[in-house]
């Protein structure tokens, strides 16, 4: 068993849950024996002096954080504050008021995957205004939490090529955190690219070693943090994002690798991450297998592989759709058209130009996938009556929507299906989430 067993939900890729949904998530985390919860935040906290950034996002407020913190404490869960503080700041830096704080004000950073970031994403570590901004944010955010930990992010700083500049700014941000009585946690990806810097990190930092594929080298990476005497967590993911209906087998392998390496090298915690890249199209149901299995791995180690996930899903949802959900979550394997951090079906649906379909994903394979999705849709549709099935009907609605996402990917040029899907996306979104962000999410759907 890991001492710290956490779940982190992305609330900054357009989708901010309602308070009712957040409470239900806490209920689920308690059932799964988690003891930490984080809300990944870029721009979706209602900072009083920065309305420009969050105006259309339906942000979470200070009062709501205090309410959620109290609810978490009632359930023996620590609500850990989370505010990215170096990279992933594009929602700030695109605005004229903040653009001067960007390392590359005109954008154009090249990612490790060869893509180009149109907008600026990273704070300029040489600009004193960057620390001044963060100082003000921390003063407003942190007093709402009873936890003394704080996840400052600092991952994927694409514009910063000098490792010394990265380390220097990271250490200054950590000073701001300590001054407010908190202990900093940070994503370890950049430091791991420069292992000579690991030894220079203060020993009170908590490194978060993230990776989301089944073959991620957790063993090698955690060994570096262990050798440096740093406390660290292993951070696998639900594999729900960029997938339409999940990547269940990858999720299993990813969590098993994280658990094994974390156990071997003495990880303090196991943090399940649940991202919403490219519009957070997937509903909560797509993440549910990973939420449950992640709790099992964190609490029971390798025994998790022998537990009955379908039965657990049925129990949590209150409707017998666990098998249906898992079938949808394995459709990405059909045809052997695999890619990292996404499903081929997602790529088909999300790219309306310049995309070349994987040669293994033939028309006959798409017909086969569509038929399975239709069967799953039909099975879930039988449980969508709130009168008969209560909260289980929402899970069923989400599974129907996931099946329709997959079917739309298989019929990518069917304008009628895509128009209906856009309407369904909005309706299903509002079952659990606030309205802010829907239009941004829909802007990533195919257009005609």
Positions of predicted regions on the chain:
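Feature activates predominantly on carbohydrate-active enzymes
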Residues: 1-161, 165, 172, 176-178, ...
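Substrate-binding groove of N-acetylhexosamine-processing glycoside hydrolases
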Residues: 27, 67-70, 76, 128-143, ...
């Amino acid at each position: 068993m890991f001492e710290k067993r956490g779940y982190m939900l992305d609330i900054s890729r357009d989708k901010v849950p309602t308070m009712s949904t957040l409470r239900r998530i806490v209920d689920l985390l308690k059932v799964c024996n988690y003891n930490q919860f984080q809300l990944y935040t870029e721009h979706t906290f209602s900072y009083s002096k920065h309305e420009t950034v969050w105006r259309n996002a339906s942000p979470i407020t200070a009062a709501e954080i205090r309410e959620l913190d109290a609810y978490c404490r009632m359930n023996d869960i620590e609500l850990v504050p989370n505010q990215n503080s170096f990279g992933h700041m594009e929602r700030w830096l695109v605005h004229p008021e903040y653009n001067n704080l960007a390392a590359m004000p005109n954008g154009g950073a090249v990612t490790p995957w060869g893509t180009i970031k149109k907008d600026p994403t990273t704070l300029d570590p040489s600009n004193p205004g960057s620390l001044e901004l963060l100082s003000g944010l921390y003063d407003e955010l942190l007093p709402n939490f009873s936890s003394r930990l704080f996840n400052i992010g600092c991952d994927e700083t694409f514009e910063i090529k000098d490792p010394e500049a990265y380390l220097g700014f990271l250490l200054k941000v950590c000073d701001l955190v300590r001054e407010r009585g908190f202990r900093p946690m940070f994503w370890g990806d950049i430091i791991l690219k420069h292992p000579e810097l690991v030894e220079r990190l203060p020993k009170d930092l908590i490194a978060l070693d993230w990776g989301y594929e089944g073959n991620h080298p957790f063993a090698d990476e955690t060994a570096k943090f262990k050798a440096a005497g740093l406390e660290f967590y292993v951070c696998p993911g639900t594999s729900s994002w960029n997938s339409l209906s999940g990547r269940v087998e990858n999720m299993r392998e990813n969590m098993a690798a994280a658990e094994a390496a974390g156990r071997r090298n003495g990880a303090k915690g196991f943090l399940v991450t649940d991202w919403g890249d490219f519009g957070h199209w997937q509903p909560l149901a797509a993440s549910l297998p990973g939420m449950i299995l992640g709790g099992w791995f964190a609490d029971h180690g390798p025994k998790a592989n022998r537990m009955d996930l379908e039965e657990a899903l049925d129990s949590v949802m209150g409707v017998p759709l666990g098998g249906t959900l898992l079938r949808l979550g394995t459709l990405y394997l059909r045809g052997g058209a695999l890619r990292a951090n996404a499903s081929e079906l997602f790529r088909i649906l999300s790219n309306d130009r310049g995309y070349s379909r994987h040669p293994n994903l033939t028309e006959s394979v798409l017909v086969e996938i569509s038929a399975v999705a239709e069967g799953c849709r039909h099975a879930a549709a039988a449980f969508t009556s709130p009168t008969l099935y209560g909260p289980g009907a929402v899970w069923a609605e989400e599974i129907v929507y996931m099946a329709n996402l997959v079917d739309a990917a298989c019929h990518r040029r069917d304008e009628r299906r895509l128009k209906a899907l856009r309407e369904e996306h909005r309706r299903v979104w509002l079952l659990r989430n606030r309205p802010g962000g829907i239009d941004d999410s829909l802007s990533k759907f195919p257009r005609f």
